[in-house]
């Protein structure tokens, strides 16, 4: 699989591989990276669902300090081949016009500004994608270590003031926050990220400049 942008793929609801921000950054006019995965354990008899979440990433999303967008292209694209070998022989399922485009639960996703996620189960078919690339002549296998989860860290200290809670992990790191939203219905959680606290204990974000570094989670009507 590869993409002009970033992708995350899953089969039957299970994420494929451990890599984040796949396929990784490259100089898109010359090359695009791709990944291969062994997915036999994720397949089952009967119908299977392959789903790919596609984001703008470095290809056409916000990039560099000048807040530029669409540096390499106007919109993201994705390409994949699912190769199946069984008693019937070998056959390829290739990305193409028969792929449905679904309404995404992600209202936004970007490296600088974070994510907006709607947990209302939205998955309506809204059309067939036109941004599918099947030409892989310019794709190269990555030679660098993939970006993946290395360690899980616990909150060291939590301080609450009104409806704001400061979660201090005790050190700076590159990572994401995991929450349990199962107790929420029709509510919204906003998580801001920062490296420093102000003297009064509030979050200091001036050094982020225009980056929002914020996750917004909209819980649905049912607990999940």
What spans do the regions from the language model cover?
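Extracellular/oxidizing-compartment recognition motifs
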Residues: 1-224
């Amino acid at each position: 699989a590869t993409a002009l942008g970033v992708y995350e793929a899953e089969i039957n609801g299970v994420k494929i591989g451990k890599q984040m921000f796949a396929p990784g950054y490259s100089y898109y006019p010359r090359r695009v990276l791709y990944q291969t995965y062994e997915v036999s354990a994720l397949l089952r008899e009967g119908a299977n669902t392959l789903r790919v979440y596609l984001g703008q990433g470095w290809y056409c999303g916000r990039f560099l300090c000048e807040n530029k967008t669409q540096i390499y292209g106007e919109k993201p694209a994705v390409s994949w081949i699912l190769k199946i070998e069984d008693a019937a022989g070998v056959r390829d399922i290739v990305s193409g016009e028969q792929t449905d485009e679904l309404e995404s639960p992600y209202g936004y996703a970007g490296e600088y500004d974070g994510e907006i996620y709607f947990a209302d189960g939205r998955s309506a078919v809204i059309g067939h994608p036109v941004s599918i690339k099947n030409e892989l002549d310019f794709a190269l296998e990555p030679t660098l270590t993939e970006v993946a989860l290395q360690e899980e860290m616990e909150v060291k200290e939590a301080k609450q003031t009104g409806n704001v809670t400061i979660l201090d992990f005790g050190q700076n790191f590159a990572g994401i926050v995991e929450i349990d939203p199962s107790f929420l219905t029709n509510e919204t959680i906003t998580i801001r990220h920062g490296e420093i606290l102000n003297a009064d204990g509030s979050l200091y974000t001036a050094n982020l400049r225009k980056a929002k570094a914020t996750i917004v989670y909209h819980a649905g009507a049912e607990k999940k």
